[in-house]
């Protein structure tokens, strides 16, 4: 006997020629003679051994042996009425239903050799016929086999020592495991989509969302269309990407546990950019603009623009006694009085009398040795410092007036006289700021001045007039004035 028997060959050309009344050419799907409509590849078709029925034990049930010819007669009757095609061996086995002459729920393991995929391809090209054995009076059992995937895994895990021990023995044939339909479908589906499994209700559920379907093809299409891109699972806070949406949700909880908190108030957020914007808008809104030339801060762009005009002004006031220069006339006068008071008095005397003499203001400053004071002889002002008396004389008794009215051009040596003079222009349409020395002929200019200069100290303003208040309580107490009028 040949140690390596030759494998049976298959026939692919017109397999319907081999289906007749004496043989079965379609796969039975159970023990009741019902034939399945699925396409399967027949791995082997053999005639049962007739001795099995002759050598049966005497203790066996006689009714079983009597029913077997009836079962065979039913099969032959169906084959006479219809011709069934033998499926093509090109199609691989997707699901399998095993049956035998005895009803049993156990999984049957056969020791016959099954064709490998390479041999199937060779036999398909050779187009060799399928050997079909038939019998007139004996039922034919057809076994459909599926090569188990466990075989390849077991053979790969075998060590080299175990292979050497088996060289002297007969080479083992590939074990074929007969699987039911649901098991075979799951094995095939898990080869490409290992995460997608049918649940107990028979539905294929997506593990990334709530989608489910009873067809695996629908779930496969859903995975390609909906979950192909992983860029959508990106954290908006730290920009870290995740493979699934569930991992992203778990990661987002970390940011919720440790939010960004404002150190000036109770504001909280999980995004750092929002916290920065909140601090800039809420806590630093009073001084958002500053001058690059002198680093002076302003609360609005309009106020900064007015400040820029001071730097860009071409008119400069120069000190006639030194190299000091400024664009503010009041600043120049303050400089002259503080630094050059004596020279200012001499210049005033020359302007009035044309010469030094008894009218000289410098001669009006005396020193009281008893009380240790410098005294102004014109008005009696006294001070322990000579420079203070000189400044007093330069401001109060010279003809140079630092405060000049913009409307009429009249000058004043003191701020008090200057303010009194400005009040005289009220009937003529001069608007004065009641919080400082500012005055203007336009009401809109006064409103801009109040918003720019006094908004920080007096944030609460009345909508009916130009009054401003430091707190809301004073504003509320002021509002009844407008109701009575």
From Swiss-Prot:
GO terms for cellular component: nucleoplasm; nucleus. It is found in: Nucleus. SUPFAM superfamilies: beta-beta-alpha zinc fingers. There is a cross-link at residues 76, 177, 181, 226 (Glycyl lysine isopeptide (Lys-Gly) (interchain with G-Cter in SUMO2)). Residues 371-455 are annotated as: Interaction with CTNNA2. A zinc finger (C2H2-type) spans 204-227, 233-255, 260-283, 289-311, 374-397, 403-425, 431-454, 460-482. Residues 1-14 have a biased composition (Basic residues). The keyword Mitochondrion does not apply. Gene3D superfamilies: Classic Zinc Finger. It comes from the Eukaryota. GO terms for biological process: negative regulation by host of viral transcription; negative regulation of DNA-templated transcription; positive regulation by host of viral transcription; positive regulation of cell growth; positive regulation of transcription by RNA polymerase II; regulation of transcription by RNA polymerase II; symbiont entry into host cell. Signal peptide: none annotated. One of its GO terms (molecular function) is transcription cis-regulatory region binding. Keywords: DNA-binding, Isopeptide bond, Metal-binding, Nucleus, Phosphoprotein, Repeat, Repressor, Transcription, Transcription regulation, Ubl conjugation, Zinc, Zinc-finger. The keyword Lipid biosynthesis does not apply. Residues 1-20 are annotated as: Disordered. InterPro entries: Snail/Krueppel_Znf, Znf_C2H2_sf, Znf_C2H2_type. The modification Phosphoserine is found at residues 60, 88. Belongs to the krueppel C2H2-type zinc-finger protein family. Binds DNA and may function as a transcriptional repressor. Interacts with CTNNA2. This is Zinc finger protein 639. It comes from Homo sapiens. The lineage of its organism: Eukaryota, Metazoa, Chordata, Craniata, Vertebrata. The gene is ZNF639.
């Amino acid at each position: 006997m040949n140690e390596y028997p030759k494998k049976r060959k298959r026939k692919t050309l017109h397999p319907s020629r081999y289906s007749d009344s004496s043989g079965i050419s379609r796969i039975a799907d159970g023990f009741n003679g019902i034939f399945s409509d699925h396409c399967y590849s027949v791995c082997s078709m053999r005639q049962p051994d007739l001795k099995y029925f002759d050598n049966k034990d005497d203790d066996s049930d006689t009714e079983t042996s009597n029913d077997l010819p009836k079962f065979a007669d039913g099969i032959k009757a169906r084959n006479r009425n219809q011709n069934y095609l033998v499926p093509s061996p090109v199609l691989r086995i997707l699901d399998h239903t095993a049956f035998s002459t005895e009803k049993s729920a156990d999984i049957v393991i056969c020791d016959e050799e099954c064709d490998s995929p390479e041999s199937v391809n060779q036999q398909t090209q050779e187009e060799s016929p399928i050997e079909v054995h038939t019998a007139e009076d004996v039922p034919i059992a057809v076994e459909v086999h599926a090569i188990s995937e466990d075989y390849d895994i077991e053979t790969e895990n075998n060590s080299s020592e175990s292979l050497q021990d088996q060289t002297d023995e007969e080479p083992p044939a590939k074990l074929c495991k007969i699987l039911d339909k649901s098991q075979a479908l799951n094995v095939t589906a898990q080869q490409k989509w290992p995460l997608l499994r049918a649940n107990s209700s028979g539905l294929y559920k997506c593990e990334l969302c709530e989608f489910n379907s009873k067809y695996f093809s629908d779930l496969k299409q859903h995975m390609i269309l909906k979950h192909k891109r992983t860029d959508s699972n990106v954290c908006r806070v730290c920009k870290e990407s995740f493979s699934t949406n569930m991992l992203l949700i778990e990661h987002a909880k970390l940011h919720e546990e440790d939010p960004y908190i404002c150190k000036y108030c109770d504001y909280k957020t999980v995004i750092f950019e929002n916290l920065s914007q909140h601090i800039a808008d809420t806590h630093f809104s009073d001084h958002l603009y500053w001058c690059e030339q002198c680093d002076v801060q302003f609360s609005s762009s309009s106020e900064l623009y007015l400040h820029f005009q001071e730097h860009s002004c071409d008119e400069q006031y120069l000190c006639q006694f030194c190299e000091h220069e400024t664009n503010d006339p009041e600043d120049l006068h303050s400089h002259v009085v503080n630094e050059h008071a004596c020279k200012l008095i001499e210049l005033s005397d020359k302007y009035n009398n044309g010469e030094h003499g008894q009218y000289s203001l410098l001669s009006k400053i005396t020193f009281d040795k008893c009380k240790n004071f410098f005294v102004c002889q014109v008005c009696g002002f006294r001070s322990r410092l000579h420079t203070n008396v000189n400044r007093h004389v330069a401001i109060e008794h010279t003809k140079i007036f630092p405060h000049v009215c913009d409307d009429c051009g009249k000058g004043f040596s003191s701020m008090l006289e200057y303010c009194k003079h400005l009040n005289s222009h009220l009937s003529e349409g001069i608007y004065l700021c009641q919080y400082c020395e500012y005055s203007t002929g336009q009401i809109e200019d006064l409103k801009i001045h109040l918003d720019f200069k006094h908004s920080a100290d007096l944030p609460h303003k009345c909508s009916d007039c130009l009054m401003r208040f430091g707190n809301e309580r004073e504003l509320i107490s002021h509002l009844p004035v407008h109701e009575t009028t």
